[in-house]
Amino acid sequence: MGQELSQHELYVEQLKKALKTRGVKVKGNDLLKFFDFVKDTCPWFPQEGTIDIKRWRRVGDCFQDYYNTFGPEKIPVTAFSYWNLIKDLIDKKEADPQVMAAVTQTEKILKVSSQTDLRDNSHNKDMDLISLESDDEEAKAPSEKMTMSNKSPKKYPAMLASQNNNTDKDPDLSEVDWDGLEDEAAKYHNPDWPPFLSRPPPYNRTAATAPAVMAVVNPKEELKEKISQLEEQIKLEELHQSLIIRLQKLKTGNERVTSSGNIESHSRTPKWPGQCLPKGKYLINKNTEEYPPKDIFPVTETMDGQGQAWRHHNGFDFTVIKELKTAVSQYGATAPYTLAIVESIADNWLTPTDWNTLVRAVLSGGDHLIWKSEFFENCRDTAKRNQQAGNGWDFDMLTGSGNYANTDAQMQYDPGLFAQIQAAATNAWRKLPVKGDPGASLTGVKQGPDEPFADFVHRLITTAGRIFGNAEAGVDYVKQLAYENANPACQAAIRPYRKKTDLTGYIRLCSDIGPSYQQGLAMAAAFSGQTVKDLLNNKNKDRGGCFKCGKKGHFAKDCRDHSNKNPESKVPGLCPRCKRGKHWANECKSKTDSQGNPLPPHQGNRDEGPAPGPEASLWGSQLCSSQQQQSISKLNRASPGSAGLDLCSTTHTVLTPEMGPQTLATGVYGPLPPNTFGLILGRGSTTVKGLQIYPGVIDNDYTGEFKIMARAISSIITIPQGERIAQLVLLPLLRTAHKIQHPYRGDKNFGSSDIFWVQPITHQKPSLVLWLDGKAFTGLIDTGADVTIIKQEDWPSHWPTTETLTNLRGIGQSNNPRQSSKYLTWKDKENNSGLIKPFVIPNLPVNLWGRDLLSQMKIMMCSPNDIVTAQMLAQGYSPGKGLGKREDGILQPIPNSGQLDRKGFGNFLATAVDILAPQRYADPITWKSDEPVWVDQWPLTQEKLAAAQQLVQEQLQAGHIIESNSPWNTPIFVIKKKSGKWRLLQDLRAVNATMVLMGALQPGLPSPVAIPQGYFKIVIDLKDCFFTIPLQPVDQKRFAFSLPSTNFKQPMKRYQWKVLPQGMANSPTLCQKYVAAAIEPVRKSWAQMYIIHYMDDILIAGKLGEQVLQCFAQLKQALTTTGLQIAPEKVQLQDPYTYLGFQINGPKITNQKAVIRRDKLQTLNDFQKLLGDINWLRPYLHLTTGDLKPLFDILKGDSNPNSPRSLSEAALASLQKVETAIAEQFVTQIDYTQPLTFLIFNTTLTPTGLFWQNNPVMWVHLPASPKKVLLPYYDAIADLIILGRDNSKKYFGLEPSTIIQPYSKSQIHWLMQNTETWPIACASYAGNIDNHYPPNKLIQFCKLHAVVFPRIISKTPLDNALLVFTDGSSTGIAAYTFEKTTVRFKTSHTSAQLVELQALIAVLSAFPHRALNVYTDSAYLAHSIPLLETVSHIKHISDTAKFFLQCQQLIYNRSIPFYLGHIRAHSGLPGPLSQGNHITDLATKVVATTLTTNLTEAQTAHALHHLNAQSLRLMFKITREQARQIVKQCPTCVTYLPIPHFGVNPKGLVPNMLWQMDVTHYSEFGKLKYVHVSIDTFSGFLVATLQTGEATKHVIAHLLHCFSIIGQPIHIKTDNGPGYTSSNFRAFCSKLHIKHTFGIPYNPQGQGIVERAHLSLKNTLEKIKKGEWYPTQGSPRNILNHALFILNFLNLDAQNKSAADRFWHTSSKKEYAMVKWKDPLDNTWHGPDPVLIWGRGSVCVYSQTHDAARWLPERLVRQVSNVTQSRE
């Protein structure tokens, strides 16, 4: 099939006939063109020789690939439609017999007609009509194929007709030439098929079949004209119409008939034969008066019995809309389930109005706006294609706008147009945003500098939808924000069209704007000499003319001036550079020569200037450079006093932060004046603008061009030509005798660029060969893998692995993979090495090098700029080569830390600038408060002030301090060292109190004995470590200080530390962390090294000396990179090493020779320092605690550090032992290959431990002061075992293999059963515990002390022993009872324990030779006394140690054992033991013979409450003088003056009538320092509360507390504080009916009563806080409550009443003096009335007439003699 042309045409003819049987008429030429396209896209198809459904689907796959590759424009419009028709034909199992019968009958009818006329008119293309069937026959059941009226029409339904057998014999039908008619009719139906679908129909679920074109299509104007010309053939037209109706009836079976009247009334314009479409949305039924159905969607079409088509809206099921709405809400608009519903709905004919109604119903406002924008854009594109196809379907028809805005017009659309509408709508739906949570602020949605405008509009519309709900309501606002919130580039693009287009137009205008557009604008601005802003505003204006002559009107290629300069042009010959063409060498652009070898860049200067190297990249390069050379004499100064010469840029330059440092030409050339050199510095104004100028040095003998190294800091910077950006400072040249490497520099540069163009990643796999323990492995570099993985097939079988508990996850998952049991040494081709533990996984296709290995290799990932890459390629450079002219650049990327062995970046700065590492700081300090701390600077003497000024200047020059305006300040001072030099210190105690202290990172001192024997070592000391570690900038202001001046001659100069200050509490910890972080990379790279770091001392040790040196070199670089400096003079490379106060000489470690100065040992502080140093050395000396005990005893006594101390003879002998031991003793380094033994010696007082390996390794000592008062020796040995095991793991990382101690196995067995410490000490110990010491003289010397084991005190009661009971009382009486005899005696102690201990001593002294069973009711003695037999040292505390020593001597002197048991006192149990204890207890009781006197009680009460003399006199009935003497003898009360008597402030007449209230401060209560005080003026009862402030809420809280104690007052008087004058407090008083008045402002006398109460309260607080009662350790509330208790209940007045008595128990009867008084208002006399209060100059009279009190001057009152009145 298809191999010959005739066969090709024959196949097409047969295919036409086959299609015709299905009612489909196509054009033969179109089918030929279709199979030509099949042949082009499927070359294999003609060779198949046959066709079936499988091969035809393969053709469809080829169409799909072609469509995806070239798009819809390159594929024929009818390709997929024909493919679908043929697919249905091939897939059909059998022909439809009804269709076959109809065809046969039609042929007969057409033959009767005028066949000749038809044939003549067969070439009239405009008369042919076509009917295409699009129903998917394959998907239908046979019953469905027969009846179509019950199915809703598909997306492209065929015309429906009634199935009526009676019409088969229509006499009006005649025969016609069907072949010619079908060919001609097919032409009018190609436009009916939808030519532009979003996806080809065979692969679109919503359009799975080809579109079927209606029998009546949208006619053209030419068709109308030709129909009018063929009026004579009307009979043929009628027959043709009947034919079509008949065929459609057979196919659809629709027999619906409508009267002709209806047809005529609902016809549309233009009208085509055989079709009449209604304008209405529903069919009018004349026979009924039913209401028309609801107008919804979609459009359906039916045919009546007369062959007339009717369209109307069918009622759509609203459950589908609800389902779609639910899917959008729950899953999102673009979820697969939602799209499936939309595609199902799109199978119907939905008009544009229907789509808009549906979308508005189910989508939010923002999403609806997005859909509408996308739908209009799709329709606009489709309309353009329709215009090219000439089918007349314009934008208004597709969108339902303009003349097609109503549903009537949209119902008349052709099926092909409906198909395009459905495609545009579904495509717009698919572009809806994914369900998310956009922001709520619409004005806050702004476009980023590199964000695409479409993404920005999408975010804006989404946010608008959430805010407005209906996006159309805010479309104008969204459009305005889309312009205002766009970035400058997009605003410039939109500005000319801002009012001429909508959001869709905005998106099109900004579609090409992105990062590359921004960079292009910057380049264009530089080319044109404009700023970016000016360029954007003027980009549509004329940009100029010729680049050669500068004139407008022509281009450079047509410039006559340029051509006239060289009238006689020479013809170039063969290029001497590439030898491949005829052109000039300076114009050669070849990258390779004729042999294919790469060519180097151009050498020398050409018209374009020097070859582009590091100093001339295209970004920031010369764009319009001037070629004039200027000397330094041409430079200008800004002013006569300017130190620098101005340097300008000769180019219009654009710099971006991504470009890094760039060189700028200045046009100034050397040399400099004689004996000078130049320093290039930046101007301050350029730094403010964001341009950083790197400083550079210009040599005196440099004759080349001076260039400026500049970098844009954070944004794009445009440097106009001629702008001053730097200055050249000339300095005198100092010539030294250093070695000269080059005789003369000239215009040459030293070295090459440090830049290396990294080769980009290609399709080739990035593999790498590494050696693991000498075996080569090839693997892929995987930056996404955390760990390195080796496939099991490559893993050697003899290399051990272990199963891990981790899971590896990637594309797959590996549970519990195996990992190498040991670290493997990796090595690459450059001999770089490290350690790695890879994982081993089976069935892995390739080995993977993960980040655990790549980080050790220092592999870096670079993202090159595409523009830079293109520029480099254009200049002839290749990746992998240096960019210098000699291509000898360093072949590695520039690291972030800079290169310390090379200076500069580029050429001209090769000897000028160091690219320093990024500044590192110490960790930030956490502060408790941000409130500034200011401590005034104290005065300094003239000598110390001069020293301080000199030291400050030195620190200022060193950069350790800077000038400061900080609000913090702490004083400084200077001290003179032994060498005579001064040292600057700062008192930072106040600052330290405000910071959170960091814990110690190294709680112990590292020991050099843990270094393995035989290791090579290097010792390093860091220079001024604190001063090389910078503080965090935010912390520097807190360490400010002031430098004073004598006689305040000038303001103090203020400075602050930039580095760690000495004296700051966290400086040691920050120093350790900073240095440790610098060393950490070296530790990881050299894991096999033994590296010790303590503060600023570092020790490196290793097996191989070469590795130690390499590690030292890397460590040196790491320290230098972080700013730390190594002191060269303190680097130790050979024995003997001095480290941390020890001398290391081979395996031996000795202490440095020390001479102890005795003349300085005078105070407790001196001896404390000395013994601290000696105790530090004890691990390396075999000095026992007993040897040092005389020295330790000196520390006892007075705790004052300056208290005098002196050396006793025993202490002097101990000091000599220390000196001898320091000089003679040594220890050795540990050998990890030998077992480690821990020896315990039973030395005097406490045992001593020693780690042993044929020589002493480390001595271990217990603390000089035991934790317990009585520590048995065997418990001390157990404590030493615990300490030794801990030290072994702490220093050596292992447990001792053997512990040798002095007890035998039986004794250890006893200790395990009867003590608590021994089982703990030996718990989980897997080694050996022995008592056989190695044969060594040192060990034998240490074994001289005998072992003490209990033998006198029995653990159980003895038989036939004397029964004794002991007891003691706090009365000082001790007693013991034996054999019905009681002995009691008086002691001088009041402690019951000490008294009973003396009773026990008396028992042991009375019966030294008798066996005893002693019972005591003291559990403490019953536990302590049995320990005395084995205690070697008793801790001295008070008098207890003295009695324990006496008791211990009695035990040692006994030869007969005794038993000491405990019995509970007052148990009430029967029996002789309880009875004997009770008798003894009664003997300690004493009957008081004298009562405590009142004076003693008064003294006790005053000591407890500090009562005044009057209260003591009245309460305890003592004399006035005795009470006064008690108060005078009190050291607390004597400092407080007596409180004056109550004054004359108005008082309440009854309780709670008048209160005074105020607030006082007591700072010692901290946050509760605000003490609110209220006092009842009648009784003086005081109520106070602690509050955290003085606001109204605190006042109200205080009053509520007062109400709960003494009730509610009638009247409250306060001052004018804000808490009392507020409206809230006024409302509070008003609601409770409390009268509130204020005193006289700023006059405290108006509040005199409460002010005196403040004084009384504070004095009481001060008194009781110094006492010995519990409130001194209590909370502030306890102390306040105690004071109120004293003032209200204990202090008595002259009537022997307290304030509480006066308040709660007022007198029921009282006599008042009677007076007459004059009213000053009317000068009338009244009375006699009683006097309530008679004050100083004033009298309070109670007017019985007015029932109110009146205050009157004393002069207006006359007393009635001897007249009184009682008041009940």
From Swiss-Prot:
Q: Which residues form a coiled coil?
A: 215-251
Q: Name one GO biological process term.
A: proteolysis
Which cofactor names does the annotation list? Mg(2+)
Alphabetically, the GO molecular function entries are: aspartic-type endopeptidase activity; DNA binding; DNA-directed DNA polymerase activity; dUTP diphosphatase activity; RNA stem-loop binding; RNA-directed DNA polymerase activity; RNA-DNA hybrid ribonuclease activity; structural constituent of virion
Zn-finger region bounds: CCHC-type: 544-561
List the catalytic activities from the record: DNA(n) + a 2'-deoxyribonucleoside 5'-triphosphate = DNA(n+1) + diphosphate; Endonucleolytic cleavage to 5'-phosphomonoester; dUTP + H2O = dUMP + diphosphate + H(+)
Domain named Peptidase A2: residues: 777-853
Q: At which residues does the record annotate a lipid attachment of kind N-myristoyl glycine? A: 2
Query: What residues does the Reverse transcriptase domain cover?
Result: 956-1144
Propeptide stretches in the record: 101-159
Which top-level group of life is the source organism from?
Viruses
Active site positions, chain numbering? 782 (protease)
List the stretches of this chain annotated as a DNA-binding region. 1713-1762
Position of motif PPXY motif? 200-203
State where Mg(2+) 3 binds.
1558, 1615, 1651
Query: Which residue positions does UniProt flag as site: Cleavage?
Result: 100-101, 159-160, 214-215, 297-298, 523-524, 756-757, 874-875, 908-909, 1493-1494
Name all RNase H type-1 domain ranges: 1358-1489
ZnF (Integrase-type) intervals: 1493-1534
Q: What does this protein do?
A: Nucleocapsid protein p14: Nucleocapsid protein.
Q: Which family does it belong to?
A: Belongs to the retroviral Pol polyprotein family.
Q: What is known of its domains?
A: Gag polyprotein: Late-budding domains (L domains) are short sequence motifs essential for viral particle release. They can occur individually or in close proximity within structural proteins. They interacts with sorting cellular proteins of the multivesicular body (MVB) pathway. Most of these proteins are class E vacuolar protein sorting factors belonging to ESCRT-I, ESCRT-II or ESCRT-III complexes. Phosphorylated protein pp24 and phosphorylated protein pp18 contains one L domain: a PPXY motif which binds to the WW domains of the ubiquitin ligase NEDD4.
Per its record, how is this protein called by name?
Gag-Pro-Pol polyprotein
Where does this protein come from, organism-wise? Simian retrovirus SRV-2
